[in-house]
């Protein structure tokens, strides 16, 4: 751990104690620099967006690849970086928890573990899910700096719209030591409020396009992330332009961005 990483960790932890905030999800170092220049205070990786940059589907990236990605983002920006660790790249509680240590060594100051088993294509049993969170929380607490550990309950993005089970899992994850709780796929203000009212730790909400930050914050959300959405906005723009080019129309290429401002070379960066 460096003084720089400790400062990032403390800044990230403090964000969870202040006003609700948006944490956008860059897909590479350039997009991280852009988001920093636009004034965001912290960044989170996107598993699906990063996988796309490697020509892979979500869930097919290795821990080695994620650690290298984290190191690149950390070197590119002075913002805190939190990592989507999916299921921890192993069903075992201890080995999944070890992913926390691995990305912390690469520069991360936060990270999440979810309760979805990509091998069996199912939600982990309740007790095993809690065991995995407890193991990850233990590792996070041993790092020597305030690593912000997020525990995810995946029901609502995996076709299992059981709010009672989601709340029970998040409450158990809180008791197991998670710093932040997250149930991606909540769709309404009432669902967000029910989750936030049921726990005492900060809650991350995956953005709902039909809701504003103010509405989600009023329901209790402390942190709002966008997942892979920014990646897909960029990819769609590129695909639409490429389709026009293929048809002989080059007007879509008339785009200007302040890349020089976004990618300025600051002394001491990284």
Question: How should these model regions be labeled?
Answer:
Residues 2-3, 12, 228-270:
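Extended, intrinsically disordered, low-complexity segments
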């Amino acid at each position: 751990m460096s003084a720089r990483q400790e400062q990032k960790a403390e800044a990230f932890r403090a964000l969870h104690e202040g006003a609700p905030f948006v944490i956008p999800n860059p897909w590479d170092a350039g997009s991280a620099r852009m988001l920093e220049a636009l004034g965001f205070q912290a960044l989170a990786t996107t598993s699906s967006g990063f996988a796309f940059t490697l020509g892979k589907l979500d869930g097919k990236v290795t821990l080695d690849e994620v650690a290298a990605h984290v190191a690149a983002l950390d070197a590119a920006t002075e913002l805190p970086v939190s990592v989507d660790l999916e299921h921890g790249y192993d069903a075992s509680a201890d080995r999944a928890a070890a992913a926390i240590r691995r990305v912390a060594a690469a520069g991360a100051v936060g990270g999440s573990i979810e309760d979805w088993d990509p091998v069996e294509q199912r939600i982990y049993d309740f007790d095993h899910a809690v065991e995995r969170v407890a193991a990850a929380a233990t590792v996070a607490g041993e790092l020597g700096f305030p690593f912000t550990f997020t525990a995810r309950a995946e029901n609502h993005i995996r076709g299992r719209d059981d709010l009672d089970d989601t709340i029970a899992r998040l409450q158990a994850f809180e008791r197991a030591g998670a710093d932040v709780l997250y149930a991606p796929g909540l769709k309404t203000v009432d669902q967000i409020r029910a989750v936030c009212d049921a726990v005492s730790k900060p809650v991350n909400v995956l953005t709902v396009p039909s809701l504003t930050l103010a509405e989600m914050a009023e329901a209790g959300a402390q942190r709002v992330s966008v997942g892979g959405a920014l990646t897909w906005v960029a990819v769609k723009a590129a695909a639409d332009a490429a389709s026009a080019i293929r048809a002989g129309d080059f007007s879509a290429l008339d785009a200007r961005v302040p890349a020089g401002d976004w990618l300025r070379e600051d002394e001491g960066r990284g």
